[in-house]
A protein has these predicted regions:
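Charged, alpha-helix-forming regions
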Residues: 1-128, 132-194
Length: 194
């Protein structure tokens, strides 16, 4: 696990993942895409055809899923009507953008040689990202970390709790994944700044 760095000559952002790491990233990104698209795909009977054509027919209520509520917070907590209108006009495009960013991770890993089914031990995946693609990965890492933190109940200053969990506790393992994605994001930000 070396994280991201900028190649001196090509100026591309590069990382080297084991097959397991690449497959884990693909799985996390795939789960995020599924979450974003499944709730958004619920048909609504009250959609105005013009609004649908202009993509102004998004949801008006805060999502029930806590991860989605964290990814799409209420813009105006003190004004329910304004919050509803803001969500209606923006959430659909935001969901599409977040899903597209996660799909970029999946596509990049597969283009770099990650097979559909990981069967080979010792497989290494070399990823090379131009700046726009690296920025897309960075945005998706933010969404992945928010999703993991929400599911785990991670809060600021609670590191001692997570470190005290036994290694075989599934929550500790999930927190390790959360920390790993944070590490990847940190190295990606650093590589982009060079």
């Amino acid at each position: 696990m070396s994280g991201f760095h900028r190649h001196r000559r090509s100026k591309l952002i590069i990382a080297n993942f084991s097959g397991f790491e690449a497959d884990l990233l693909r799985s996390l990104a795939g789960q995020l895409v599924e979450l974003l698209r499944n709730e958004a795909a619920v048909p609504r009977d009250d959609v105005d055809p013009f609004e649908a054509m202009m993509d102004f027919s998004g949801p008006t209520q805060e999502p029930e899923d806590p991860v989605l509520a964290r990814l799409f917070p209420t813009a105006y907590p003190d004004d329910e009507e304004a919050a509803s209108e803001f969500r209606r006009f923006t959430e659909g495009a935001l969901r599409d953008g977040k899903a597209a960013a996660a799909v970029t991770i999946i596509d990049t890993l597969e283009e770099a040689g990650l097979p559909e089914q990981l069967t080979e031990d010792g497989l290494m995946i070399d990823v090379e990202l131009d700046e726009p693609t690296a920025e897309t990965w960075m945005r998706s890492f933010t969404d992945l970390r928010l999703a993991l933190a929400t599911r785990l109940g991670v809060e600021e200053g609670d590191e001692a709790y997570w470190h005290a969990l036994p290694e075989d506790d599934p929550r500790a393992q999930a927190h390790d994944i959360y920390a790993w994605v944070g590490y990847l994001q940190e190295t990606l930000v650093d590589a982009l700044s060079r």
